Amino acid sequence: MVTIRADEISNIIRERIEQYNREVKIVNTGTVLQVGDGIARIHGLDEVMAGELVEFEEGTIGIALNLESNNVGVVLMGDGLLIQEGSSVKATGRIAQIPVSEAYLGRVINALAKPIDGRGEISASEFRLIESAAPGIISRRSVYEPLQTGLIAIDSMIPIGRGQRELIIGDRQTGKTAVATDTILNQQGQNVICVYVAIGQKASSVAQVVTTLQERGAMEYTIVVAETADSPATLQYLAPYTGAALAEYFMYRERHTLIIYDDLSKQAQAYRQMSLLLRRPPGREAYLGDVFYLHSRLLERAAKLSSSLGEGSMTALPIVETQSGDVSAYIPTNVISITDGQIFLSADLFNSGIRPAINVGISVSRVGSAAQIKAMKQVAGKLKLELAQFAELEAFAQFASDLDKATQNQLARGQRLRELLKQSQSAPLTVEEQIMTIYTGTNGYLDSLEVGQVRKFLVELRTYLKTNKPQFQEIISSTKTFTEEAEALLKEAIQEQMDRFILQEQA
């Protein structure tokens, strides 16, 4: 018979008591009262924070936006088709954040920073909050470096600087996305990281942009954040903040970044949809009262950082769509008041064959010539004035029958200047080529040509100058100034090319 030893048993019990680890885990949970239209009403979750992520039983993630006395309004980051009434929900204790790293370059991701290009997972060890505070006044410095778009009309008359926010506004189908993608293409070799955020676009349009960037080798320094028209409203609302978080990651690492939001009208509509479903009180045009804050907190994150923070920059090009050219609608006026200027694209100009269809008269850059190199300031000074005078004269000339010689000459010059501003899509020009083009037009060298010959002559002149006078490009790129030597070289090239061109045309 086995003897029971009391001391041995008591030792075992004592050891077990000592090893016992009393760990109390408190989980903030709730129950689904109602779900539908991308919104869930939750009972419980008493200690949830505004904007906190919550996790449903079947794995869907949501954001707690409405904290009411008897329930919590949660917007779903997914379709939520498997969520049932009565199922449990738990608070995660986290605010929305995404992984960030250099590995995102060249990839297409969604608003949750998950890859959607079928090229596997993206490795990242660092995380960044989707919504973070914008740099303060002391953290910034004034904008002084140019960000070249490659479009003559913009770089000469509506210059954009690194750290600026410049709105691109116009009706649908006026070339807003084309201006943005051309700007990305022109950053090749400029050491600028680009982030293109597509909000509520057709999947085919996004695919077309990605294909263009891949063909031109621009995806190497670009990240595309895409939430197409069939995505839940929550993800369309979050996409711009995800893009901004990625751009900020590079900005704080002393890099220059360019971010394009295409377009913020769709983000505002997604936010309106969410707000109305959450039964928040609607305001003007049924948008929520804080729709201004929606865009201001996003665009204020663009900045030129001070030298103590490494002088990185984040330049924002938000796009807003207007209805029949009405810039006085709610969202356009909001974004105009937040940004440092706007590029207005006109449907009338687009339809009359002037592309890019930039209305120079009402487009403005509030940074101005501070964002231009000295050489560009020297040649582009009188271009805007001459074009403004031409537009006024042209309107007057429609009613006047007989015009004096000076007026006729001014009209002829204006037509040629307007012609030199035309550019094909995906064909950005270097700053040296732009300076050469503007100088040729404003100094009357094109006056002897027919309007239809202007573009052909300029294309040939660019090739001739590059081949036969490479010193011109070297002087501009090294000194950033339009020196007398550069001017002499350019005059020679124009004269030689003009003689060749006239002989060709006569042949």
From Swiss-Prot:
Alphabetized GO MF terms: ATP binding; proton-transporting ATP synthase activity, rotational mechanism
Catalytic activity: ATP + H2O + 4 H(+)(in) = ADP + phosphate + 5 H(+)(out)
Membrane disposition: Peripheral membrane protein
Coiled-coil regions, chain positions: none
One of the record's GO cellular component terms: chloroplast thylakoid membrane
Site residues by UniProt (Required for activity): S363
Database matches in CDD domains: ATP-synt_F1_alpha_C (cd18113), ATP-synt_F1_alpha_N (cd18116), F1-ATPase_alpha_CD (cd01132)
Keywords: ATP synthesis, ATP-binding, CF(1), Chloroplast, Hydrogen ion transport, Ion transport, Membrane, Nucleotide-binding, Plastid, Thylakoid, Translocase, Transport
Family that this chain belongs to: Belongs to the ATPase alpha/beta chains family.
Function according to Swiss-Prot or TrEMBL: Produces ATP from ADP in the presence of a proton gradient across the membrane. The alpha chain is a regulatory subunit.
Family annotation (HAMAP family): ATP_synth_alpha_bact
The protein's name in its UniProt record: ATP synthase subunit alpha, chloroplastic
